Amino acid sequence: MAPRGFSCLLLSTSEIDLPVKRRA
């Protein structure tokens, strides 16, 4: 896996996971 792909995926997951945790 390329570092860019991993970083992008991790960042995207964090952005989606953060709001979800805040709502919960």
UniProtKB/Swiss-Prot annotation:
Domain of life, source organism: Eukaryota
GO aspect biological process, one term: negative regulation of execution phase of apoptosis
InterPro entries reported for this sequence: Humanin (IPR028139)
Keywords: Cytoplasm, Secreted
Induction behaviour: Down-regulated 6 hours following staurosporine (STS) treatment and up-regulated 24 hours following STS treatment. Down-regulated 6 hours following beta-carotene treatment, returning to its basal level 24 hours following beta-carotene treatment.
UniProt key word Amino-acid biosynthesis: no
Protein name: Humanin-like 8
